[in-house]
Amino acid sequence: MKKKTSLSEEDQALFRQLMTGTRQIKQDTIVHRPQRKKITEVPVKRLIQEQADASHYFSDEFQPLLNTDGPVKYVRADVSHFELKKMRRGDYSPELFLDLHGLTQQQAKQELGALIAACRREHVFCACVMHGHGKHILKQQTPLWLAQHPHVMAFHQAPKEYGGDAALLVLIEVEEWLPPELP
């Protein structure tokens, strides 16, 4: 099979003329794979500690006063009620999703704590928590737990595209991100 080139016969002849007397370079370089850094136990311990710290706020005995009329919603006292309206309209799109289907209450608390810690660590402002319909245990408990956490600014029943009444959109207070200082 003949190779097709876009060069004319004249250009090909000129190229061959310029390449006379050259020889092919022998490739004798060995490329070493970069050594992987050993994963230390400190980050794993830190993640577990963040998760435990975040789930520490969730109590089954404390019942925050939430509005039971209409969709599930909550806004912290120092946050504008306009944020709820923006959540209801779908102005926020969640970057992280948490599915609590099939989890026990204890597992759900741990996962909620891990989600909030991950949002703060990754500077994610909005997340979606899918509690499902099921036996309504997690559906009732999830808003009560979220309202107790100091880093939860607000939550509202999710729009249809994110799960409707089987999910919540949650606004998380993230630390102000500062770029690293240059030396």
Curated annotation (Swiss-Prot):
It holds the Pfam family Smr. One of its GO terms (molecular function) is rRNA binding. It is an enzyme of class 3 (hydrolase). Coiled coil: none annotated. SUPFAM superfamilies: SMR domain-like. Its EC number is 3.1.-.-. Belongs to the SmrB family. This is Ribosome rescue factor SmrB.
